[in-house]
Swiss-Prot record:
E.C. code: 4.3.2.1
SUPFAM superfamilies: L-aspartase-like
A GO CC term attached to the entry: cytosol
Assigned protein family: Belongs to the lyase 1 family. Argininosuccinate lyase subfamily.
Gene Ontology MF, one: argininosuccinate lyase activity
Protein name as it appears in the record: Argininosuccinate lyase
Domain of life: Bacteria
Length: 452
Protein backbone atom coordinates (compact mmCIF):
# COMPACT_ATOMS: atom_id res chain seq x y z
CA UNK A 1 0.00 0.00 0.00
CA UNK A 2 2.84 2.39 0.73
CA UNK A 3 5.71 0.43 -0.89
CA UNK A 4 6.53 3.36 -3.19
CA UNK A 5 7.75 5.44 -0.26
CA UNK A 6 10.14 2.88 1.27
CA UNK A 7 13.30 1.22 -0.01
CA UNK A 8 12.69 -2.03 1.91
CA UNK A 9 9.60 -3.93 3.04
CA UNK A 10 8.36 -3.86 6.61
CA UNK A 11 10.17 -6.53 8.60
CA UNK A 12 8.28 -9.51 10.01
CA UNK A 13 8.47 -8.49 13.71
CA UNK A 14 6.97 -5.09 12.91
CA UNK A 15 4.25 -6.70 10.79
CA UNK A 16 3.36 -9.00 13.63
CA UNK A 17 3.43 -6.22 16.22
CA UNK A 18 1.24 -3.80 14.26
CA UNK A 19 -1.27 -6.35 12.93
CA UNK A 20 -4.79 -6.19 14.37
CA UNK A 21 -6.61 -8.50 11.97
CA UNK A 22 -6.44 -11.26 14.57
CA UNK A 23 -9.25 -9.54 16.47
CA UNK A 24 -10.77 -6.78 14.32
CA UNK A 25 -11.76 -9.30 11.61
CA UNK A 26 -14.89 -9.74 13.74
CA UNK A 27 -15.98 -6.44 12.16
CA UNK A 28 -15.70 -7.79 8.60
CA UNK A 29 -19.41 -7.70 7.79
CA UNK A 30 -19.64 -4.09 9.03
CA UNK A 31 -16.56 -3.05 7.06
CA UNK A 32 -18.05 -4.60 3.93
CA UNK A 33 -21.26 -2.62 4.49
CA UNK A 34 -19.30 0.62 4.95
CA UNK A 35 -17.26 -0.02 1.81
CA UNK A 36 -20.40 -0.79 -0.20
CA UNK A 37 -22.04 2.46 0.95
CA UNK A 38 -18.88 4.38 0.05
CA UNK A 39 -18.84 2.89 -3.44
CA UNK A 40 -22.50 3.78 -3.96
CA UNK A 41 -21.54 7.34 -3.04
CA UNK A 42 -18.73 7.21 -5.62
CA UNK A 43 -21.25 6.03 -8.20
CA UNK A 44 -23.60 8.92 -7.36
CA UNK A 45 -20.63 11.27 -7.87
CA UNK A 46 -19.94 9.55 -11.24
CA UNK A 47 -16.51 8.48 -10.01
CA UNK A 48 -17.48 4.81 -10.35
CA UNK A 49 -19.53 3.24 -13.14
CA UNK A 50 -22.66 1.20 -12.54
CA UNK A 51 -20.84 -1.90 -13.79
CA UNK A 52 -17.98 -1.40 -11.36
CA UNK A 53 -20.44 -0.75 -8.53
CA UNK A 54 -22.25 -4.00 -9.32
CA UNK A 55 -18.94 -5.88 -9.28
CA UNK A 56 -17.96 -4.31 -5.95
CA UNK A 57 -21.31 -5.08 -4.32
CA UNK A 58 -21.17 -8.67 -5.55
CA UNK A 59 -17.60 -9.03 -4.33
CA UNK A 60 -18.33 -7.54 -0.91
CA UNK A 61 -21.29 -9.87 -0.50
CA UNK A 62 -18.98 -12.80 -1.18
CA UNK A 63 -16.41 -11.42 1.27
CA UNK A 64 -19.01 -11.12 4.04
CA UNK A 65 -20.36 -14.62 3.39
CA UNK A 66 -16.84 -16.03 3.24
CA UNK A 67 -15.97 -14.42 6.56
CA UNK A 68 -19.06 -15.90 8.22
CA UNK A 69 -18.20 -19.32 6.82
CA UNK A 70 -14.57 -19.05 7.92
CA UNK A 71 -13.43 -19.31 4.31
CA UNK A 72 -11.25 -16.18 4.22
CA UNK A 73 -7.51 -16.50 4.70
CA UNK A 74 -6.61 -13.47 6.80
CA UNK A 75 -3.16 -12.05 6.10
CA UNK A 76 -1.36 -10.38 9.05
CA UNK A 77 1.00 -8.55 6.69
CA UNK A 78 -2.04 -6.53 5.56
CA UNK A 79 -2.41 -5.36 9.15
CA UNK A 80 -6.15 -5.06 9.69
CA UNK A 81 -9.59 -6.14 8.54
CA UNK A 82 -9.94 -3.10 6.27
CA UNK A 83 -6.94 -3.85 4.05
CA UNK A 84 -7.74 -7.55 4.10
CA UNK A 85 -11.29 -6.90 2.87
CA UNK A 86 -10.02 -4.64 0.10
CA UNK A 87 -7.38 -7.22 -0.88
CA UNK A 88 -9.89 -10.08 -1.10
CA UNK A 89 -12.34 -7.82 -2.96
CA UNK A 90 -9.68 -6.92 -5.53
CA UNK A 91 -8.85 -10.60 -6.02
CA UNK A 92 -12.54 -11.27 -6.68
CA UNK A 93 -13.46 -8.35 -8.96
CA UNK A 94 -10.17 -6.90 -10.20
CA UNK A 95 -9.88 -3.19 -11.08
CA UNK A 96 -13.21 -2.25 -9.51
CA UNK A 97 -11.85 -3.39 -6.16
CA UNK A 98 -8.87 -1.06 -6.47
CA UNK A 99 -11.24 1.85 -7.11
CA UNK A 100 -13.00 1.30 -3.77
CA UNK A 101 -10.36 3.26 -1.84
CA UNK A 102 -10.97 6.41 -3.89
CA UNK A 103 -12.07 9.35 -1.73
CA UNK A 104 -11.41 7.81 1.66
CA UNK A 105 -8.65 7.06 4.12
CA UNK A 106 -8.34 4.18 6.52
CA UNK A 107 -8.69 6.79 9.25
CA UNK A 108 -12.29 7.68 8.45
CA UNK A 109 -13.11 4.11 7.38
CA UNK A 110 -11.86 2.63 10.66
CA UNK A 111 -14.00 5.02 12.69
CA UNK A 112 -17.13 4.46 10.62
CA UNK A 113 -16.80 0.67 10.68
CA UNK A 114 -16.35 0.72 14.46
CA UNK A 115 -19.46 2.88 14.87
CA UNK A 116 -21.59 0.60 12.69
CA UNK A 117 -20.28 -2.44 14.54
CA UNK A 118 -20.96 -0.82 17.94
CA UNK A 119 -24.56 -0.16 16.92
CA UNK A 120 -25.08 -3.85 16.16
CA UNK A 121 -23.37 -5.08 19.30
CA UNK A 122 -25.08 -2.58 21.60
CA UNK A 123 -28.40 -3.73 20.16
CA UNK A 124 -27.49 -7.33 21.00
CA UNK A 125 -26.46 -6.30 24.53
CA UNK A 126 -29.76 -4.46 25.04
CA UNK A 127 -31.66 -7.63 24.07
CA UNK A 128 -29.63 -9.64 26.60
CA UNK A 129 -30.28 -7.03 29.31
CA UNK A 130 -34.00 -7.38 28.65
CA UNK A 131 -33.65 -11.16 28.90
CA UNK A 132 -32.06 -10.85 32.35
CA UNK A 133 -34.75 -8.36 33.38
CA UNK A 134 -37.44 -10.87 32.41
CA UNK A 135 -35.71 -13.58 34.43
CA UNK A 136 -35.59 -11.31 37.48
CA UNK A 137 -39.24 -10.36 36.99
CA UNK A 138 -40.29 -14.01 36.91
CA UNK A 139 -38.38 -14.77 40.12
CA UNK A 140 -39.79 -11.62 41.76
CA UNK A 141 -43.37 -12.65 41.03
CA UNK A 142 -42.67 -16.07 42.52
CA UNK A 143 -41.49 -14.62 45.85
CA UNK A 144 -43.63 -11.52 46.31
CA UNK A 145 -44.43 -12.50 49.92
CA UNK A 146 -41.14 -14.21 50.76
CA UNK A 147 -39.35 -12.38 53.55
CA UNK A 148 -35.58 -12.15 53.86
CA UNK A 149 -33.07 -10.14 55.88
CA UNK A 150 -32.06 -6.86 54.33
CA UNK A 151 -28.45 -5.98 55.08
CA UNK A 152 -26.47 -2.82 55.70
CA UNK A 153 -22.75 -3.05 56.47
CA UNK A 154 -23.22 -6.84 55.96
CA UNK A 155 -25.32 -6.92 59.16
CA UNK A 156 -29.00 -7.86 59.45
CA UNK A 157 -30.88 -4.55 59.22
CA UNK A 158 -34.60 -4.81 58.38
CA UNK A 159 -36.88 -7.36 56.73
CA UNK A 160 -37.51 -6.96 53.00
CA UNK A 161 -39.36 -9.08 50.51
CA UNK A 162 -37.27 -11.14 48.12
CA UNK A 163 -39.27 -9.53 45.31
CA UNK A 164 -38.14 -6.09 46.50
CA UNK A 165 -34.53 -7.29 46.57
CA UNK A 166 -34.61 -8.71 43.05
CA UNK A 167 -36.50 -5.71 41.69
CA UNK A 168 -33.64 -3.50 42.91
CA UNK A 169 -31.41 -5.24 40.36
CA UNK A 170 -34.05 -4.76 37.68
CA UNK A 171 -33.90 -1.03 38.41
CA UNK A 172 -30.13 -1.10 37.88
CA UNK A 173 -30.51 -2.98 34.62
CA UNK A 174 -33.15 -0.52 33.43
CA UNK A 175 -30.65 2.29 33.86
CA UNK A 176 -28.01 0.20 32.06
CA UNK A 177 -30.38 -0.33 29.15
CA UNK A 178 -31.07 3.41 28.92
CA UNK A 179 -27.34 4.15 28.97
CA UNK A 180 -26.72 1.70 26.14
CA UNK A 181 -29.49 3.30 24.08
CA UNK A 182 -28.02 6.78 24.61
CA UNK A 183 -24.52 5.52 23.86
CA UNK A 184 -25.69 3.92 20.62
CA UNK A 185 -27.45 7.09 19.55
CA UNK A 186 -24.28 9.10 20.18
CA UNK A 187 -22.15 6.66 18.19
CA UNK A 188 -24.35 6.75 15.08
CA UNK A 189 -22.37 9.51 13.37
CA UNK A 190 -20.91 9.15 9.87
CA UNK A 191 -17.20 9.98 9.84
CA UNK A 192 -16.60 8.57 6.34
CA UNK A 193 -15.72 11.46 4.05
CA UNK A 194 -13.31 13.02 6.52
CA UNK A 195 -10.33 11.45 4.77
CA UNK A 196 -7.09 11.20 6.70
CA UNK A 197 -7.83 14.45 8.57
CA UNK A 198 -8.69 17.27 6.12
CA UNK A 199 -11.60 15.89 4.11
CA UNK A 200 -11.59 14.47 0.59
CA UNK A 201 -11.63 15.72 -3.00
CA UNK A 202 -14.12 13.02 -3.98
CA UNK A 203 -16.75 13.60 -1.31
CA UNK A 204 -20.29 12.66 -2.17
CA UNK A 205 -23.50 13.40 -0.32
CA UNK A 206 -22.49 12.29 3.17
CA UNK A 207 -26.07 12.48 4.43
CA UNK A 208 -27.12 9.92 1.83
CA UNK A 209 -24.22 7.68 2.85
CA UNK A 210 -25.28 8.03 6.49
CA UNK A 211 -28.81 6.95 5.58
CA UNK A 212 -27.44 3.91 3.74
CA UNK A 213 -25.65 2.81 6.93
CA UNK A 214 -28.47 3.66 9.32
CA UNK A 215 -26.50 6.47 10.97
CA UNK A 216 -28.26 9.57 12.30
CA UNK A 217 -25.95 12.41 11.29
CA UNK A 218 -22.58 13.32 9.80
CA UNK A 219 -19.49 14.59 11.60
CA UNK A 220 -19.07 18.39 11.33
CA UNK A 221 -15.25 18.51 11.63
CA UNK A 222 -12.87 16.16 9.85
CA UNK A 223 -10.04 16.58 12.38
CA UNK A 224 -12.32 15.64 15.24
CA UNK A 225 -14.01 12.87 13.24
CA UNK A 226 -10.92 10.76 12.57
CA UNK A 227 -9.49 11.15 16.07
CA UNK A 228 -12.70 10.97 18.13
CA UNK A 229 -13.04 7.88 20.29
CA UNK A 230 -15.63 9.25 22.71
CA UNK A 231 -18.05 6.60 21.51
CA UNK A 232 -15.56 3.86 22.45
CA UNK A 233 -14.97 5.33 25.91
CA UNK A 234 -18.70 5.76 26.51
CA UNK A 235 -19.49 2.22 25.38
CA UNK A 236 -16.68 0.80 27.50
CA UNK A 237 -17.98 2.71 30.52
CA UNK A 238 -21.58 1.61 29.87
CA UNK A 239 -20.41 -2.01 29.71
CA UNK A 240 -18.27 -1.58 32.84
CA UNK A 241 -21.19 -0.17 34.87
CA UNK A 242 -23.45 -2.95 33.59
CA UNK A 243 -20.86 -5.53 34.63
CA UNK A 244 -20.55 -3.88 38.06
CA UNK A 245 -24.29 -4.37 38.56
CA UNK A 246 -24.10 -7.99 37.44
CA UNK A 247 -21.11 -8.51 39.70
CA UNK A 248 -23.10 -7.23 42.68
CA UNK A 249 -25.94 -9.63 41.87
CA UNK A 250 -23.44 -12.44 41.41
CA UNK A 251 -21.85 -11.63 44.78
CA UNK A 252 -25.23 -11.80 46.51
CA UNK A 253 -26.08 -15.10 44.83
CA UNK A 254 -22.69 -16.54 45.79
CA UNK A 255 -23.28 -15.57 49.41
CA UNK A 256 -26.87 -16.85 49.46
CA UNK A 257 -25.92 -20.21 47.95
CA UNK A 258 -22.92 -20.84 50.21
CA UNK A 259 -23.27 -23.77 52.59
CA UNK A 260 -22.65 -21.41 55.52
CA UNK A 261 -25.54 -19.07 54.67
CA UNK A 262 -27.87 -21.43 52.80
CA UNK A 263 -30.46 -18.85 51.75
CA UNK A 264 -30.70 -20.19 48.19
CA UNK A 265 -29.75 -23.03 45.88
CA UNK A 266 -28.43 -22.78 42.32
CA UNK A 267 -29.26 -25.39 39.71
CA UNK A 268 -26.74 -28.23 39.43
CA UNK A 269 -26.36 -27.63 35.68
CA UNK A 270 -24.91 -24.19 36.39
CA UNK A 271 -22.29 -25.25 38.94
CA UNK A 272 -19.05 -27.22 38.90
CA UNK A 273 -17.33 -29.57 41.32
CA UNK A 274 -13.88 -30.06 42.76
CA UNK A 275 -11.11 -32.33 41.53
CA UNK A 276 -10.33 -33.40 45.11
CA UNK A 277 -13.32 -32.55 47.36
CA UNK A 278 -16.32 -34.73 46.46
CA UNK A 279 -18.87 -32.60 48.31
CA UNK A 280 -18.16 -29.31 46.55
CA UNK A 281 -20.68 -27.41 44.42
CA UNK A 282 -19.03 -24.27 43.12
CA UNK A 283 -20.80 -21.23 41.55
CA UNK A 284 -18.02 -20.74 39.00
CA UNK A 285 -20.07 -18.73 36.51
CA UNK A 286 -20.90 -16.15 39.17
CA UNK A 287 -17.26 -15.89 40.18
CA UNK A 288 -16.25 -15.38 36.54
CA UNK A 289 -18.83 -12.61 36.18
CA UNK A 290 -17.19 -10.86 39.13
CA UNK A 291 -13.78 -11.21 37.49
CA UNK A 292 -14.99 -9.98 34.09
CA UNK A 293 -16.39 -6.87 35.76
CA UNK A 294 -12.90 -6.06 37.01
CA UNK A 295 -11.41 -6.63 33.54
CA UNK A 296 -13.97 -4.32 31.89
CA UNK A 297 -13.38 -1.59 34.46
CA UNK A 298 -9.68 -1.83 33.56
CA UNK A 299 -10.49 -1.68 29.85
CA UNK A 300 -12.59 1.47 30.25
CA UNK A 301 -9.85 3.17 32.23
CA UNK A 302 -7.26 1.94 29.72
CA UNK A 303 -8.88 3.46 26.62
CA UNK A 304 -9.26 6.79 28.41
CA UNK A 305 -5.57 6.68 29.30
CA UNK A 306 -4.77 5.96 25.64
CA UNK A 307 -6.78 8.98 24.49
CA UNK A 308 -5.57 11.50 27.06
CA UNK A 309 -2.03 11.49 25.61
CA UNK A 310 -3.03 12.36 22.03
CA UNK A 311 -3.32 15.67 20.26
CA UNK A 312 -5.07 16.01 16.90
CA UNK A 313 -5.53 14.12 14.72
CA UNK A 314 -5.32 10.34 14.23
CA UNK A 315 -2.59 8.31 15.93
CA UNK A 316 -1.92 4.59 15.77
CA UNK A 317 -2.57 4.39 19.51
CA UNK A 318 -6.24 4.28 18.56
CA UNK A 319 -5.86 0.78 17.17
CA UNK A 320 -6.10 -0.45 20.77
CA UNK A 321 -9.73 0.66 20.92
CA UNK A 322 -10.82 -2.42 18.94
CA UNK A 323 -9.61 -4.79 21.62
CA UNK A 324 -11.58 -2.81 24.21
CA UNK A 325 -14.74 -2.74 22.07
CA UNK A 326 -14.60 -6.41 21.17
CA UNK A 327 -13.66 -7.54 24.67
CA UNK A 328 -16.39 -5.49 26.34
CA UNK A 329 -19.08 -6.68 23.94
CA UNK A 330 -18.11 -10.32 24.25
CA UNK A 331 -17.90 -10.22 28.06
CA UNK A 332 -21.20 -8.38 28.48
CA UNK A 333 -23.30 -10.52 26.15
CA UNK A 334 -21.96 -13.79 27.54
CA UNK A 335 -22.27 -12.66 31.15
CA UNK A 336 -25.85 -11.48 30.64
CA UNK A 337 -26.80 -14.86 29.17
CA UNK A 338 -25.37 -16.93 32.02
CA UNK A 339 -26.76 -14.55 34.65
CA UNK A 340 -30.25 -15.01 33.20
CA UNK A 341 -29.79 -18.78 33.47
CA UNK A 342 -28.56 -18.44 37.06
CA UNK A 343 -31.51 -16.27 38.10
CA UNK A 344 -34.00 -18.68 36.56
CA UNK A 345 -32.41 -21.59 38.43
CA UNK A 346 -32.30 -19.77 41.79
CA UNK A 347 -34.47 -21.32 44.49
CA UNK A 348 -34.81 -19.54 47.84
CA UNK A 349 -34.81 -21.54 51.07
CA UNK A 350 -37.86 -19.90 52.66
CA UNK A 351 -37.65 -21.78 55.95
CA UNK A 352 -33.96 -20.81 56.36
CA UNK A 353 -34.78 -17.19 55.61
CA UNK A 354 -37.63 -17.22 58.14
CA UNK A 355 -35.48 -18.76 60.88
CA UNK A 356 -32.74 -16.22 60.26
CA UNK A 357 -35.21 -13.37 60.62
CA UNK A 358 -36.73 -14.83 63.78
CA UNK A 359 -33.31 -15.23 65.37
CA UNK A 360 -32.39 -11.61 64.66
CA UNK A 361 -33.55 -8.20 65.81
CA UNK A 362 -34.52 -7.23 62.26
CA UNK A 363 -37.73 -5.42 63.20
CA UNK A 364 -36.29 -3.46 66.10
CA UNK A 365 -36.85 -0.29 64.05
CA UNK A 366 -40.54 -1.16 63.78
CA UNK A 367 -40.71 -1.50 67.55
CA UNK A 368 -39.12 1.91 67.96
CA UNK A 369 -41.67 3.33 65.52
CA UNK A 370 -44.47 1.65 67.47
CA UNK A 371 -43.35 3.42 70.64
CA UNK A 372 -43.49 6.69 68.69
CA UNK A 373 -47.15 5.93 67.96
CA UNK A 374 -47.61 5.64 71.74
CA UNK A 375 -46.29 9.16 72.30
CA UNK A 376 -42.49 8.81 72.59
CA UNK A 377 -40.00 10.74 70.51
CA UNK A 378 -38.07 8.55 68.09
CA UNK A 379 -34.75 9.35 69.78
CA UNK A 380 -36.14 8.10 73.11
CA UNK A 381 -37.77 5.03 71.58
CA UNK A 382 -34.57 4.23 69.67
CA UNK A 383 -32.59 4.34 72.91
CA UNK A 384 -35.13 2.19 74.76
CA UNK A 385 -35.18 -0.55 72.12
CA UNK A 386 -31.38 -0.40 71.75
CA UNK A 387 -30.98 -0.99 75.49
CA UNK A 388 -33.31 -3.97 75.37
CA UNK A 389 -31.40 -5.40 72.38
CA UNK A 390 -28.11 -4.96 74.21
CA UNK A 391 -29.40 -6.78 77.29
CA UNK A 392 -30.77 -9.62 75.15
CA UNK A 393 -27.46 -10.07 73.34
CA UNK A 394 -25.42 -10.04 76.55
CA UNK A 395 -27.81 -12.56 78.10
CA UNK A 396 -27.33 -14.87 75.13
CA UNK A 397 -30.87 -14.46 73.83
CA UNK A 398 -31.50 -14.31 70.11
CA UNK A 399 -34.45 -12.84 68.35
CA UNK A 400 -37.24 -10.43 68.90
CA UNK A 401 -39.22 -12.61 71.29
CA UNK A 402 -36.59 -11.98 73.95
CA UNK A 403 -36.99 -8.20 73.86
CA UNK A 404 -40.02 -7.81 76.19
CA UNK A 405 -38.32 -10.00 78.81
CA UNK A 406 -35.00 -8.23 78.48
CA UNK A 407 -36.58 -4.78 78.64
CA UNK A 408 -37.56 -5.23 82.28
CA UNK A 409 -35.38 -3.11 84.49
CA UNK A 410 -33.74 -1.53 81.46
CA UNK A 411 -36.51 0.81 80.38
CA UNK A 412 -39.29 2.38 82.47
CA UNK A 413 -42.01 -0.16 83.44
CA UNK A 414 -44.64 1.58 81.34
CA UNK A 415 -42.42 1.36 78.25
CA UNK A 416 -41.60 -2.27 78.99
CA UNK A 417 -45.30 -3.05 79.13
CA UNK A 418 -45.87 -1.27 75.84
CA UNK A 419 -42.95 -3.13 74.30
CA UNK A 420 -44.45 -6.43 75.41
CA UNK A 421 -47.81 -5.54 73.88
CA UNK A 422 -46.51 -4.44 70.51
CA UNK A 423 -43.66 -6.92 70.01
CA UNK A 424 -44.53 -8.81 66.84
CA UNK A 425 -42.08 -11.45 65.65
CA UNK A 426 -43.68 -11.81 62.20
CA UNK A 427 -41.42 -9.99 59.75
CA UNK A 428 -44.25 -9.78 57.22
CA UNK A 429 -45.98 -7.24 59.47
CA UNK A 430 -42.88 -5.07 59.18
CA UNK A 431 -43.02 -5.21 55.40
CA UNK A 432 -46.75 -4.55 55.16
CA UNK A 433 -46.43 -1.49 57.40
CA UNK A 434 -44.10 0.25 54.96
CA UNK A 435 -46.28 2.71 53.07
CA UNK A 436 -43.75 5.00 51.37
CA UNK A 437 -43.51 4.93 47.60
CA UNK A 438 -40.85 2.45 46.50
CA UNK A 439 -40.79 0.63 49.83
CA UNK A 440 -40.62 -3.12 50.44
CA UNK A 441 -44.34 -3.64 51.08
CA UNK A 442 -45.87 -6.15 48.65
CA UNK A 443 -48.15 -3.41 47.33
CA UNK A 444 -45.26 -1.19 46.30
CA UNK A 445 -43.09 -4.14 45.27
CA UNK A 446 -45.82 -5.25 42.88
CA UNK A 447 -46.12 -1.76 41.40
CA UNK A 448 -42.34 -1.54 41.05
CA UNK A 449 -42.28 -4.89 39.24
CA UNK A 450 -44.79 -3.56 36.73
CA UNK A 451 -42.84 -0.35 36.16
CA UNK A 452 -39.30 -1.74 36.04
Amino acid sequence: MWSGRFSSPVCAPVQSFTASVGFDRAMCHCDAAVLAAHCRSLYLRRVMSIADLADVERGLSEVAMGARAGAISWRPELEDVHRNVEHVLTELVGKAGRMAHTGKSRNDQVSTTARVWLRHMAGAAICRVEELERALAARSRACLNTMMPGLTHMQVAQPVTAAHYLTAYRCMLSRDRSRLVRCTRGACVLTLGSGALAGTNHGGDRYTTADMLGLHCVSPNSLDAVSDRDFVMEYALCCAVLMVHMSRLAEDMIAWSSSIVGFAVLGDALCTGSSIMPQKKNPDILELVRAKAAVLIGGAMGIMAVMKAQGLAYNRDNQEDKAVLLGASRAVTRSLSVMALAVRSLRLNKSRLRRRLESSFAIATDLADSLVWHGMTFRDSHEAVARAVGVAIRAGHAGLRALPLCSRGVVPPLLAARLARIAQPDARVSAFRKDSTGSTSPKWSFRAMRRA
